[in-house]
Amino acid sequence: MGCGLRKLEDPDDSSPGKIFSTLKRPQVETKTEFAYEYVLLDFTLQASSNPEVIKINSILDIVTKVENYYLKGYIVGAIHPVIQPVGQRKHLPASYLYRVVLLRLKLSPKNSAAPSGQRRPRLVIEECPLTSEAQTNDAAKELIEKINVAAKRGMKFVGFISQHYSPSKFCNGTNHDGDIESMLHVRHGSDENCRSWNEGTLSGQSSESGIEEELHHESGQYQMEQNGSPTSSKSRKGEASDNKLYTVFNAFDDDSTSWAYQEGILSMKVTRKGSVISTLDADWLELTTFYYKQGLSLIDSFVFWETSKGEHLPKSLEGFFIYEEEGSGVPGSSRKGNDAIVVEQWTVIEGCEIKTDYGPLLHTLAEFGWLLTSVLPTPVLRHDSEGNLATKQIVFLQRPVMWNSAAQTPDKKASRHIKGEDKNKATSRSIGLDTTSSQPAESRHLPEECRLSPSRECWTKEGRLAQHNSFSGFSSSDNVLRELDDGQFDQEDGVTQVTCM
C-alpha cells in the first residue's frame, strides 16, 4: 500500500495528498440510504482580521459558539487543532487555530423521513488533567476508562483536544511577549520573511527543510540560553501547567443508549531534523481495517509526540486509536462492518486563515454517505512559495458496508495504477514532505489522473468552488471524484485502493 519515493527534482511531484480506500471508485461513488451535510468552523485563540475565523478565549467557549447549529440538528463530529502543537510549534500562529466539523443527516429521496428515535444531544467539553510526564501506556488505559465511564451516562465521545496557553495575542503581527515568539512568528506578505523561510527551496532543498532548520536553530539557541540544553522537546520548567487536555462529548439527556470504547494500535515511522519531526509514515488501512470489519468506528487518536529531555529520539512514534462500538439507534449500526477512506491532506494556512483543506472532498463524499469521524493533525510542516504554512493532516471517513467489501484483509498491500509516463514513477507514502519538491503543491499542475484537491481558495464559507491560476482546480465539488481516472480504482477484488490527489 503506497508508493516509492520520487526524486527531489521531479517537476511532476505535485500531489497535495493521497487517498486510501477499502473500495473501488464506483463503490465509493454509490449513493446510500443516508447522506450527510457538513459545516466547517474555524476558531482561534488569537485576534484575527478574518471575520469568518471565530475568536475564543478558551476551548470551552466552543460550546456556546455552536449552540445554534445544534438547534438546527447538527452535532460536532470532529474537533482538532490545525497543526499538532509539538515543541516549538506551540509558538507558531497557526498553533492557535482549531477546526470544528459539524454534521447532520441529509435525507435522500429514498427516505424522506428522519430516523425514528433520533435524539438531540448537547455539546460538553470537560477538562481532563494530563501532564507530559503522564503520557504513558498506563495513562492511555486511564483515558479509555474515563470515556467508557462517561459513555454509560449517555456521553458519546467525540475526541480529545489540547490547549497551549501562551501570553501571545497576535496572529501575524509584532509579538511583545518574548524573543522566541518574535523569532518564530512570520508576517504574511513580508518579502523578506518569505525569502528567508524559503531559502531551502532556492538552494535545492525542500521548503519544509527550511522550516525545520529555522525552528531547530532558533528554538535551540533560545533553549540553550534558558536551560543550558539545546532543542529539548520537553516543555521548559514551569510550562507543564500551561497545557490542558479536554475531552469532548455529545451528551444525551437519557442513558438508554450507551457506547463502548477500546484502543487500537497506532504506530508511525518518523524522520527528524534535529529533534523536529519532518516526515512520518504509517499503513493506515493495515492498522484500522481489522477494526472496521468488526463494525467499530474510529473516533479519535492519541499520539505521544513529545520526548523527555535527554531521551533518545525514536524512529517511530506510538499511540493509540480510539474505536467506538456503536449503540442502538445509530443509522447503519445493524450492519456488520464499515468501509473506510483515509486521506493524507496538505492543509495550507495563510496567516490565521485556512486556504486549502479537506473541505471540498468532504462535501463531495458526504453525498455518498461518507461520515467523517476523526482528523489527525501532525507536526509536519512546509511553506509554499508565497510564505504560507502547509501542514499534513490525516482524515478518516467511514460508511457501513453495503456489500462484501469488508472481506479485505488489513495485511494486503495496495497498488497504484497510473497512465502515461507517470506509470513507472513511484510516489512516497511518507506523510511529511514526501515529494521533497522545491515547489509548493498549490503552485504546480497535477497530472490528469491525480487530481483530487481543488485550488488553494477553492472552498469558500458559502460552499462554492473557485479557481486559482497557480493550481489546477475544479469547477465544482461534484467533479472532484469524477476527475479521478477509472484505472486507478480498477483493481482486483480484495485489494485496498490508493490514489494520489
From Swiss-Prot:
Cell location: Cell membrane
Residues modified as Phosphoserine: S405, S430
Record flagged with keyword Metal-binding: no
Biased composition (Polar residues): 220-233, 427-441
InterPro entries: Raftlin (IPR028169)
A GO-annotated cellular component: plasma membrane
Lipidated residues (S-palmitoyl cysteine): C3
Composition bias, Basic and acidic residues: 410-425
Modified-residue entries (Phosphothreonine), positions: T409
Membrane topology of the entry: Lipid-anchor
A Gene Ontology biological process term: response to exogenous dsRNA
The organism's place on the tree of life at top rank: Eukaryota
Pfam families recorded: Raftlin
Lipid-conjugated positions (N-myristoyl glycine): G2
Annotated spans, Disordered: 1-20, 196-239, 407-449
Keywords in alphabetical order: Cell membrane, Lipoprotein, Membrane, Myristate, Palmitate, Phosphoprotein
Described purpose of this protein according to its UniProt entry: Upon bacterial lipopolysaccharide stimulation, mediates clathrin-dependent internalization of TLR4 in dendritic cells, resulting in activation of TICAM1-mediated signaling and subsequent IFNB1 production. May regulate B-cell antigen receptor-mediated signaling.
Family, per entry: Belongs to the raftlin family.
Protein name: Raftlin-2
Organism of this sequence: Homo sapiens
Lineage, broadest ranks: Eukaryota, Metazoa, Chordata, Craniata, Vertebrata
